[in-house]
Amino acid sequence: MGFNESLKIAAQGLNAERIRMNVISSNLANINTDDAGNGLPYIKKEPLFKTVKFKNYFGVEVEKIENAKNPFSEKYDPSNPLANKAGYVKTPNISAIRELVNMISATRAYQADAQVISESKAMSQSSLQI
């Protein structure tokens, strides 16, 4: 693998993890959004990654950002104007703990990709000194 290939693959990883972090941030910011303007709560988003072939190596990119398939949660709040006749309000089915774990995972992957770029640059500079 050449210098350019390793940089391109690591850069793809950085970009994918950046998008993943943005999606996680959006989910956390909307964890209490009971009405997203359409009468329904905010729907959790999830990035869908796909493998991208680059010569003889593989990288990654975000293919699309999908709405989560899990249903909404319900909480009992009869005083809420969005409550149904039984007094329940639909809320986003977002777990703050899961999102924070995903954020840590994305951060670590981002750091690993940044380290690959740093090491590739150092190896390239060392080879120029030979």
Where are these regions (language model features)?
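Amphipathic alpha-helical polymerization modules
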Residues: 1-130
